[in-house]
């Protein structure tokens, strides 16, 4: 059971959530109902007084940062946008949990980055700066970075916010394809019931 208190205010009390492996799980509700707070608590971004979160059968607290990053990738609703970074450089950031300070980028890292750019259809953008991209392109690039982590669990906080309907559909289709083809477990927050269907 998960409970969250922020200051003197009890936000969540005795919540039980199970996310099935290999499925897409969506937390849905109106703005301000606590979806993002629940999501962030479930992945350890907000501290819960009762540490009771497990990921793949292992307590969240028992993971090192690198171990956790190899299991789970998280995309917040509005990621910090680097102004002077290319798409390829950003996607390479997803490889950090696998890199050692004394080693250069390995062939495997390059192959995984190429794969992530390919599956998200962002390969043609690899040399562009992040601020030059449209909203839908940016979101696909952030997902490519998350995929470069090779996570077993992809967690997204309102991945279609601020996108027009075409880009929303594009992102939802990409997530469905990743789940269907790779068995990637996806946990996300949405406030539009129609997107979850």
Task: Outline where the language-model segments fall.
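The feature captures the beta-strand-to-loop junction immediately N-terminal to the Walker
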Residues: 28-30
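Helix-to-loop junction immediately C-terminal to a conserved catalytic motif
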Residues: 43
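Conserved ABC transporter NBD signature motif
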Residues: 51-59, 68
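Conserved ABC ATPase "signature" region
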Residues: 92, 107-125
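Conserved ABC ATPase signature
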Residues: 104, 129-133, 137
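Conserved catalytic motifs of ABC-family nucleotide-binding domains
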Residues: 150
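Catalytic Walker B motif of ABC-type/P-loop ATPase nucleotide-binding domains
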Residues: 154-158
